[in-house]
Amino acid sequence: MNQEVKNKIFSILKITFATALFIFVAITLYRELSGINFKDTLVEFSKINRMSLVLLFIGGGASLVILSMYDVILSRALKMDISLGKVLRVSYIINALNAIVGFGGFIGAGVRAMVYKNYTHDKKKLVHFISLILISMLTGLSLLSLLIVFHVFDASLILDKITWVRWVLYVVSFFLPLFIIYSMVRPPDKNNRFVGLYCTLVSCVEWLAAAVVLYFCGVIVDAHVSFMSFIAIFIIAALSGLVSFIPGGFGAFDLVVLLGFKTLGVPEEKVLLMLLLYRFAYYFVPVIIALILSSFEFGTSAKKYIEGSKYFIPAKDVTSFLMSYQKDIIAKIPSLSLAILVFFTSMIFFVNNLTIVYDALYDGNHLTYYILLAIHTSACLLLLLNVVGIYKQSRRAIIFAMISILLITVATFFTYASYILITWLAIIFVLLIVAFRRARRLKRPVRMRNIVAMLLFSLFILYVNHIFIAGTLYALDIYTIEMHTSVLRYYFWLTILIIAIIIGMIAWLFDYQFSKVRISSKIEDCEEIINQYGGNYLSHLIYSGDKQFFTNENKTAFLMYRYKASSLVVLGDPLGDENAFDELLEAFYNYAEYLGYDVIFYQVTDQHMPLYHNFGNQFFKLGEEAIIDLTQFSTSGKKRRGFRATLNKFDELNISFEIIEPPFSTEFINELQHVSDLWLDNRQEMHFSVGEFNEEYLSKAPIGVMRNEENEVIAFCSLMPTYFNDAISVDLIRWLPELDLPLMDGLYLHMLLWSKEQGYTKFNMGMATLSNVGQLHYSYLRERLAGRVFEHFNGLYRFQGLRRYKSKYNPNWEPRFLVYRKDNSLWESLSKVMRVIRHK
């Protein structure tokens, strides 16, 4: 049997053992906890002195510093070029992480290897030293177990009830001399033979420090037992937690402590409260400190570790791949740490709502307390809602959090004033200021589904908050106290009002004050780009007056777009030098991300699909555009006799067609205005993707008109030069609706013939919306749904009629798409586009 197979078998056995032990512990712990009166536990908690809690948390955070001696010994033994301060900071972070997700200390060992591998040339010796540290976590307990074996600590009660524990103690105790002898005979460094002994002493002191923290928890909850008996129970519990491989020893450690103190006659409610306080002080507090420290550490260490690893250097491509993600992860560590701290802060102060309610019940001025309670609750909820925004480095979310911290501070100062909590709020506030200066964006996009989710989440949190307060008051039997119930009745609505006011103020600040940040290039730059590189079927719409422009740094390419509802809706493909499109889009997306806007492309071709895909977009087919090949177009032949009949009819009625070049006279514009107004019939003009009747816009291109025999304009169409591929398009097509004549046919036919005479080779007749969308059962559901709309809702909008009409000109159909981010909603994106088109 080779070593690899042995390792696999060992891993399977280890996992099986840990799983079986976890199931056993969970079942036993459930049985024990089922008999505990949680109301009595809450009563006991309400009796605890606050100053004692503060001292406990300080002691819990400080006790982990002892473990830093491992790293001090390690750095000195290997003569690492690293400052003592950095060693202490890094060690604290490692040990806090190891305490939560330890798996017998293997997590801490792995992180140590990653960090310190960069500071020594002898990697083998480093691994040997780290192995000693890992094993010494058990040898410290082994030394303490010896003290139980020799009856220095009294564990007789628990040993009499659980006899097999005695044999575990013997085995663990016997491990100590073996380890000391081995570490001295075969040390990792011959000049440091006593490293194993030093680590054992550090481990022993650290376990004693943890025991003191738990013992102090017992003193706080008035669970008085002799220290000698207590320490014996703690050692046995620690052994159980360590060998269980369960992160933090959760369950196994707690079960032994619960059973041990039960044998000493301590009420289970007090033991449970003692364990909760211990977990908070010895695990939660150090993690908070570690999160703060991690905002400033680990960046260069992790980077150098990956760069220097022998497994990655030979594989250059793989290294580049991993390094790209590694840099992203490292960059997010500070914001992630702060987001976690803000989350914990909101949770802690949500619990403190109970303190405000409790104080209010015994104070005559209920109204003041409940206004403060509403402010406190609102601030906590806002803090919680902006955790993701803080992680995403949004300035708006950080400002929300800063305002929330200030409101919580005010409510705390006027109610349950605690200097330690106010100090903590000040620390978080300072970290938020630092984060605000580093933030990469002003705000995140506002999406409807996110708003709905936040509303539902807020209602859920407020409901849970109400249940928590009500349940606690019931458990403490203080509902009998007389109070102003009318104030309680309006507490929920007052909270909602405060949240709405704060959100409204910040939203106004960012949506209006920061709207000045939006920039737009000059139209002259766009004209120069089109003249040099050509345009497209939509490029003439730069003159419509309802768009802004974004150019690249060298002014060789641009986009035309419009802002609407936290989105930048771009019309068509980029224009200009195709080699600059990547740079242009990257700059545009960076610009949009900074301002917190979504990016939507409307009516783009399939030519640049790979480019849009690179920016994390998905596509929806809007329909197809009819492009007529003028080289093949003719009114001759049997199939075209309908075209000839239409043209002949206009000739018989003395209706003429002509192209009028700008500039236009006021009289001519007034004639067109008369036709346009009658054609619109009080309907609203469309915008953005089409032009509108505007003298300045119309004066940018020729206009085709049809006149009756009195020389009055009865129909007109505006031309749209495209500046590419010898193509031309039309925009506005309007006629007098009271005339029973095929004026649209006449305009199209005359325009087609005129365009062909002028040497154009392509004529764009516009898009047939939803045409040829979702026709296969393999298509996306959203496209199949759109296809059904095309087929069955022709009465609301002439989808099929529009395609049939254009098909008689035998065009080539080119697809047009909507491009939107993959995490956006299609229907919300379509809604924003429609709002842009229908509202100027």
From Swiss-Prot:
<dbReference type="GO" id="GO:0006629">
    <property type="term" value="P:lipid metabolic process"/>
</dbReference>
<keyword id="KW-1133">Transmembrane helix</keyword>
<dbReference type="InterPro" id="IPR051211">
    <property type="entry name" value="PG_lysyltransferase"/>
</dbReference>
<feature type="transmembrane region" description="Helical">
    <location>
        <begin position="53"/>
        <end position="73"/>
    </location>
</feature>
<keyword id="KW-1003">Cell membrane</keyword>
<keyword id="KW-0808">Transferase</keyword>
<keyword id="KW-0472">Membrane</keyword>
<feature type="transmembrane region" description="Helical">
    <location>
        <begin position="395"/>
        <end position="415"/>
    </location>
</feature>
<keyword id="KW-0046">Antibiotic resistance</keyword>
<feature type="topological domain" description="Cytoplasmic">
    <location>
        <begin position="222"/>
        <end position="229"/>
    </location>
</feature>
<dbReference type="GO" id="GO:0055091">
    <property type="term" value="P:phospholipid homeostasis"/>
</dbReference>
<feature type="transmembrane region" description="Helical">
    <location>
        <begin position="201"/>
        <end position="221"/>
    </location>
</feature>
<feature type="transmembrane region" description="Helical">
    <location>
        <begin position="129"/>
        <end position="149"/>
    </location>
</feature>
<feature type="transmembrane region" description="Helical">
    <location>
        <begin position="338"/>
        <end position="358"/>
    </location>
</feature>
<comment type="similarity">
    <text>Belongs to the LPG synthase family.</text>
</comment>
<dbReference type="Pfam" id="PF03706">
    <property type="entry name" value="LPG_synthase_TM"/>
</dbReference>
<dbReference type="InterPro" id="IPR016181">
    <property type="entry name" value="Acyl_CoA_acyltransferase"/>
</dbReference>
<dbReference type="GO" id="GO:0016755">
    <property type="term" value="F:aminoacyltransferase activity"/>
</dbReference>
<feature type="transmembrane region" description="Helical">
    <location>
        <begin position="230"/>
        <end position="250"/>
    </location>
</feature>
<protein>
    <recommendedName>
        <fullName>Phosphatidylglycerol lysyltransferase</fullName>
        <ecNumber>2.3.2.3</ecNumber>
    </recommendedName>
</protein>
<feature type="transmembrane region" description="Helical">
    <location>
        <begin position="370"/>
        <end position="390"/>
    </location>
</feature>
<feature type="topological domain" description="Extracellular">
    <location>
        <begin position="251"/>
        <end position="271"/>
    </location>
</feature>
<dbReference type="GO" id="GO:0005886">
    <property type="term" value="C:plasma membrane"/>
</dbReference>
<feature type="topological domain" description="Extracellular">
    <location>
        <begin position="359"/>
        <end position="369"/>
    </location>
</feature>
<feature type="transmembrane region" description="Helical">
    <location>
        <begin position="490"/>
        <end position="510"/>
    </location>
</feature>
<keyword id="KW-0443">Lipid metabolism</keyword>
<feature type="topological domain" description="Cytoplasmic">
    <location>
        <begin position="150"/>
        <end position="161"/>
    </location>
</feature>
<feature type="topological domain" description="Cytoplasmic">
    <location>
        <begin position="74"/>
        <end position="89"/>
    </location>
</feature>
<feature type="topological domain" description="Cytoplasmic">
    <location>
        <begin position="437"/>
        <end position="450"/>
    </location>
</feature>
<feature type="topological domain" description="Cytoplasmic">
    <location>
        <begin position="511"/>
        <end position="840"/>
    </location>
</feature>
<feature type="transmembrane region" description="Helical">
    <location>
        <begin position="90"/>
        <end position="110"/>
    </location>
</feature>
<dbReference type="Pfam" id="PF09924">
    <property type="entry name" value="LPG_synthase_C"/>
</dbReference>
<feature type="topological domain" description="Cytoplasmic">
    <location>
        <begin position="391"/>
        <end position="394"/>
    </location>
</feature>
<feature type="topological domain" description="Extracellular">
    <location>
        <begin position="30"/>
        <end position="52"/>
    </location>
</feature>
<feature type="transmembrane region" description="Helical">
    <location>
        <begin position="451"/>
        <end position="471"/>
    </location>
</feature>
<dbReference type="InterPro" id="IPR024320">
    <property type="entry name" value="LPG_synthase_C"/>
</dbReference>
<feature type="topological domain" description="Extracellular">
    <location>
        <begin position="111"/>
        <end position="128"/>
    </location>
</feature>
<feature type="transmembrane region" description="Helical">
    <location>
        <begin position="162"/>
        <end position="182"/>
    </location>
</feature>
<comment type="function">
    <text>Catalyzes the transfer of a lysyl group from L-lysyl-tRNA(Lys) to membrane-bound phosphatidylglycerol (PG), which produces lysylphosphatidylglycerol (LPG), a major component of the bacterial membrane with a positive net charge. LPG synthesis contributes to bacterial virulence as it is involved in the resistance mechanism against cationic antimicrobial peptides (CAMP) produces by the host's immune system (defensins, cathelicidins) and by the competing microorganisms (bacteriocins).</text>
</comment>
<dbReference type="GO" id="GO:0046677">
    <property type="term" value="P:response to antibiotic"/>
</dbReference>
<feature type="transmembrane region" description="Helical">
    <location>
        <begin position="272"/>
        <end position="292"/>
    </location>
</feature>
<dbReference type="GO" id="GO:0050071">
    <property type="term" value="F:phosphatidylglycerol lysyltransferase activity"/>
</dbReference>
